[in-house]
């Protein structure tokens, strides 16, 4: 039936519930100071921009882009693990005494155009970008003072890739710029010596890691610090709590910066503004703490490679599904592409990003700034996922139902946005909809159904209590609008 007279109280209860679940973020207070320990750092509210953004682009770019074989772990797979495929690849294609360092001079990036990249990411519908400033091979994409002769200014491109991309992103778009930074380096002698001393000394952290972390933040002002390569040492060795406390308290990005959860073994899914937990993490159920699903369009490698076939790439439909299922459960997506050594992005990656941008242009209303609904996945139809508008304003609640599979057989769909088996307490307390009076809850007087992208087309629908029966517009009309991959119904209840 209609919204209860005690709607204001119930709306307040919705806000309390969401806040308790850490779904809605807040801007941290400018004078709050955090101590260098997890108990204090974990109290920091998540900056609102990150929760609203939902979609980011990840870039794995570096010397490993030169051999373009296997994955970005090329060096250690070849020299450390002695993987036969990598060993044979080198034997077939390079002289016997060839070293990984020699790839750096071939990392030319002569076609790298930061403006072109920025415009593509803007068109993709992403709201933030994260670039690998340094991967596990230790090569930096900026002229690090602590990586002499092993950075993009001294060898290879002879350019500050980080600086150029940061400037272009900020000039050409409203996207936020972030940096990935690997803590450990496979073959750095300072790191290997610290390990030989059972991590009882921290020479690598003191002389390499901490100076570079500070340099990156102070010079390039990244609003995402995406830490990695942490798992071989505890956070105390990396002095992670000290660094994060400085980020939150005194850094030039203290009010807006966000960090992930890779700060030493045991920190994953435990500490950080958002949790990655693992690569390609997508639990499919609501998570209380903000999280991020980092996945790569090439299913196997994060770096660009040529030993790849079409089936190794995610389809545009799969990308859209990953966005929907992640955002419905309180996550963001970080979608990775690997540029070529020349500085170009392969057409297949560009196609996926532009397809995503077109889809978000029509359906982004249900993605950006949304929060989870009381149900993430439809009770009966597993191909339907839900989000809702953040605020229940003007006595209205707006739900978005994302349909992943088109009902070709009937052109009709039954969904249960309020749940099939009504739990009066749960639904009334979380929605403000009084379900205890019987009769139709969803009706023409209290409910409006619109298909995003076809707002000018009246949608035929009817309801039986909590079941909503929707008739799609003719498929050829939908196709003419360029609506593909997944279809969104906006359900407004007053």
Swiss-Prot record:
The keyword Glycoprotein applies. Keywords: Glycoprotein, Glycosidase, Hydrolase, Signal. Glycans are attached at residues 113, 377. Disulfide bonds: none annotated. One of its GO terms (molecular function) is alpha-L-fucosidase activity. GO terms for cellular component: lysosome; outer acrosomal membrane; sperm plasma membrane. InterPro entries: FUC_metazoa-typ, Fucosidase_C, Glyco_hydro_29, Glyco_hydro_b, Glycoside_hydrolase_SF. GO terms for biological process: binding of sperm to zona pellucida; defense response to bacterium; fucose metabolic process; glycoside catabolic process. Residues 1-25 form the signal peptide. SMART domains: Alpha_L_fucos. It catalyses: an alpha-L-fucoside + H2O = L-fucose + an alcohol. Its EC number is 3.2.1.51. It comes from the Eukaryota. It is an enzyme of class 3 (hydrolase). Alpha-L-fucosidase is responsible for hydrolyzing the alpha-1,6-linked fucose joined to the reducing-end N-acetylglucosamine of the carbohydrate moieties of glycoproteins. Belongs to the glycosyl hydrolase 29 family. This is Putative alpha-L-fucosidase. The gene is Fuca.
């Amino acid at each position: 039936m209609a919204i209860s007279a005690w709607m204001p109280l119930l709306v307040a209860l919705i806000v309390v519930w969401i806040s308790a679940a850490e779904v809605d973020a807040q801007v941290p207070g400018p004078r709050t100071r955090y101590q260098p320990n997890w108990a204090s750092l974990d109290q920091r509210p998540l900056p609102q921009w990150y929760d609203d953004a939902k979609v980011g682009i990840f870039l794995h770019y570096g010397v490993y882009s030169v051999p373009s074989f296997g994955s970005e772990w090329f060096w250690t797979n070849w020299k450390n693990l002695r993987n036969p495929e990598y060993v044979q690849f080198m034997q077939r294609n390079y002289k016997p005494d060839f070293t990984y360092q020699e790839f750096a001079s071939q990392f030319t990036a002569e076609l790298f155009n930061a403006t072109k990249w920025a415009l593509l990411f803007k068109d993709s519908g992403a709201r933030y970008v994260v670039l690998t400033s340094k991967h596990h091979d230790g090569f930096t994409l900026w002229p690090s003072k602590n990586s002499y002769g092993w950075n993009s200014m001294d060898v290879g491109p002879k350019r500050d890739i980080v600086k150029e991309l940061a400037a272009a992103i900020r000039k050409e778009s409203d996207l936020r710029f972030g940096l990935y930074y690997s803590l450990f380096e496979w073959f750095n002698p300072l790191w290997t010596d610290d390990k030989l001393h059972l991590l009882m000394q921290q020479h690598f952290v003191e002389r390499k890691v901490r100076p570079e972390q500070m340099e990156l933040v102070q010079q390039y002002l990244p609003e995402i610090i995406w830490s990695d390569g942490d798992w071989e040492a505890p956070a105390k060795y990396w002095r992670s709590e000290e660094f994060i406390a400085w980020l939150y308290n005194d850094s030039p990005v203290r009010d807006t910066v966000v960090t992930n959860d890779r700060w030493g073994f045991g920190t994953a899914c435990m500490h950080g503004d958002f949790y990655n937990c693992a690569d390609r993490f997508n639990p499919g159920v609501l998570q209380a703490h903000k999280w991020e699903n980092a996945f790569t369009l090439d299913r196997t490698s994060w770096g660009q490679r040529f030993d790849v076939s079409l089936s190794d790439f995610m389809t545009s439909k799969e990308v859209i599904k990953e966005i929907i299922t992640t955002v419905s459960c309180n996550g963001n997506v970080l979608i990775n592409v690997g540029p070529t050594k020349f500085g170009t992005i392969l057409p297949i990656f560009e196609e996926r990003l532009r397809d995503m941008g077109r889809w978000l242009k029509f359906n982004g209303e249900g993605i950006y700034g949304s929060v989870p609904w009381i149900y993430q996945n439809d009770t009966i139809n597993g191909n339907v996922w839900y989000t809702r508008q953040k605020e229940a304003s003007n006595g209205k609640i707006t739900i978005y139902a994302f349909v992943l599979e088109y009902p070709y057989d009937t052109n009709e769909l039954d969904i249960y946005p309020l749940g099939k088996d009504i739990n009066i307490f749960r639904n009334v307390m979380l929605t403000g909809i009084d379900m205890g009076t019987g009769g139709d809850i969803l009706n023409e007087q209290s409910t409006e159904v619109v298909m995003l992208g076809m707002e000018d087309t009246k949608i035929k629908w009817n309801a039986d209590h909590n079941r909503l029966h929707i008739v799609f517009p003719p498929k050829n009309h939908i196709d003419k609008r360029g609506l593909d991959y997944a279809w969104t119904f906006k359900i407004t209840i007053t």
